[in-house]
Amino acid sequence: MSSGIKEYNELIKTIVNDMVEQKKNENRIIDESESESESESENNVYQDVIPESKTQTQDNRVSFTETKYTEMKTLDNGFLQKYDVKLYGSDKDNYDIINDFLQENQSEEAFYIIDLGEIVKSYNNWIRLMPDVKPFYAVKCNPNPVILEALSELGVNFDCASEKEIRNIIDITNDPSRIIFANPIKMSSKIRFARSNDVDILVFDSEYELFKIKLFHPNAKLILRLAVDDSHSICRFNCKFGSKLNEVEELLTIAKTLRLNIIGFSFHVGSGCLSPEPFYNALADCRQATDIAIKLGFDISIIDIGGGFPGVDKKIRFEDIANRVNDGIRDFFNEENSNKKIQFIAEPGRYFAQKTHTLVINVIGKKVVYDEERNEKINVYYLNEGTYGSFNCIQNDHYEPTLLPFNEQKETCFRSKIFGQSCDSIDVIANDILLPELAIGESLYVENFGSYTLSASSANFNGFTPTSKFKYIFKDQVQN
């Protein structure tokens, strides 16, 4: 099968190139007096290569499942009861809540406290600051099924990158129209899977992906991912994904020749973006790409502004990014936004997930070593979590977690080193940290730990499985 696909791809590419060149040559020898319009001829070089596909002019609009999107929302009591969610008022801080669960849980196992109220607050903040952009939650960030269902209840749609993620969302929503298959590179079998499950919105960034889509999902609604400036981001993606602006016309021409349906453009400024300007500049690129698409006869109905939104307003505020996105929509797509010709969507992950999780861990081992150069002791602690579990984010997401002792006292702090529970010497959570003296069995906690932690952890290294105990709460919200 793979050999046949390769041969077919090469054949299609050869045919496309030959037909395009042939059409260009024909246009060159046409006498100007016989041409109705020179500019019209230039704009339609590829129009007659293959007869116009009906799908390019019909059934091109994307209608996502309607929700009361501009209305502030919360989760109803039925949902909270379904998952035995414990309610807390705003007078309770993390210490009080952790203490409640420690009293109930005498196990040595690590556990997460997940505040679903943070999801509601984030959602309402989004629609207040960026009402013209519909969020499609990036499932890869945290695929916890309760979080996914909570987001679905609020009307959030979903960005999926794999068959498993698609299956999970269909199981929860029973509505494949709420999914964008946003991975630009997909196995042929996964494209077939998307087609058989009515997942029609696919992202691509190369002609080879177009060839696969032509074979296995020819009626898909396609979004071309652009490579944009991601130099202000902690995790940069455009070295791997995205087509440059000067490649757009060629790719769209191939799509038109193959009778594929282009409906929009997407971009990703990188995860952990520290400046709002890349969003604005990328929207300017989308404007140029949209103009090229219109010239070729495509009806553009989606602009996907990707992810990169902060979960915690620490190094940059979400509001600053939202304001700049709104500026870009106004400056480059004001008419299309006003008449709802184009739907703007985004792929937030950590924005929704990061603040929801607090990880509670404890000390399972300890020893004291001496730094002869500095003539001082170093306390070495071993915890019941590590970099093969939730703390993988230290390497994979460039995250620097803050470990807080639960029994915090105003006492002398000592240089400390913290290891995870595996047998690997690189399982280091903190190399040099100041902590008070801790005893075996004492608890620590990490706040804002819900993004790219469990989702990227190793499944079973050394036989240690990822943390699987979750305590759900709902804090600081008025219930229906």
Model-assigned labels for residue ranges:
Residues 2-202, 207-220, 255-257, 261, ...:
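A charged N-terminal "starter" segment
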